[in-house]
């Protein structure tokens, strides 16, 4: 059964950035900077051409459009009307074919279970009251043999110092108040929720940042930001 797994304050907070979501030099420039790494990680674990993909918590559509450009039949879902409006407008300007819906992961999983080859949920789990519910919904959305991707922040001292103190207050890479440390998720927690739904871990990598060069990179260090890929076992027979 679908739940109202939503934090209205979070929706309003991110919706307030809708008008500059696609500005690569704006408040959310970090999303633009890390998106190529997200795509690199995704494409290392699955092909996208001709695949049916859903981007959960798509925001203004940065990753959703990248999935479509790589050949996926992409659907982006979010609960922010403002962000979906931004996503749809940018999609039209880009000449891409992307579908967007204002619906929760849980509700979509109730209506379209097992329909997607690829499920992505990036930088979203730490912004909902019940992240385990979203993980379960993403699992249900995936076809047998499909791949489910998450990215979030580790609940570690290093993440607090770098992602909050450093990124929000010292370097001002992202708006202050973007993150709540208590909502960060340890890799062991994410892996347990995924296992509970029957997913198998396929890979996990961190996202590192070099403050001297201003460049992001994939790394084996999952102490701060990390990406995880899980596979849903293929149907027997």
Curated annotation (Swiss-Prot):
Q: Known Pfam families for this protein?
A: Methyltransf_11
Question: Its domain of life?
Answer: Bacteria
Q: Where does S-adenosyl-L-methionine bind?
A: 38, 57, 78, 122
Pathway given for this chain reads: Cofactor biosynthesis; ubiquinone biosynthesis
The record's keywords, sorted A to Z, are: Methyltransferase, S-adenosyl-L-methionine, Transferase, Ubiquinone biosynthesis
One annotated GO biological process: methylation
Q: Where is the signal peptide?
A: none
Q: Name one GO molecular function term.
A: 3-demethylubiquinol 3-O-methyltransferase activity
User: What is catalyzed by this enzyme?
Assistant: a 3-demethylubiquinol + S-adenosyl-L-methionine = a ubiquinol + S-adenosyl-L-homocysteine + H(+); a 3-(all-trans-polyprenyl)benzene-1,2-diol + S-adenosyl-L-methionine = a 2-methoxy-6-(all-trans-polyprenyl)phenol + S-adenosyl-L-homocysteine + H(+)
* UniProt-listed InterPro entries: Methyltransf_11, SAM-dependent_MTases_sf, UbiG_MeTrfase
- Listed EC numbers: 2.1.1.222, 2.1.1.64
Q: Which family does it belong to?
A: Belongs to the methyltransferase superfamily. UbiG/COQ3 family.
Per the entry, what this protein does is: O-methyltransferase that catalyzes the 2 O-methylation steps in the ubiquinone biosynthetic pathway.
What is this protein identified as?
A: Ubiquinone biosynthesis O-methyltransferase
Which species is listed as the source? Methylococcus capsulatus (strain ATCC 33009 / NCIMB 11132 / Bath)
- Lineage of the organism: Bacteria, Pseudomonadati, Pseudomonadota, Gammaproteobacteria, Methylococcales
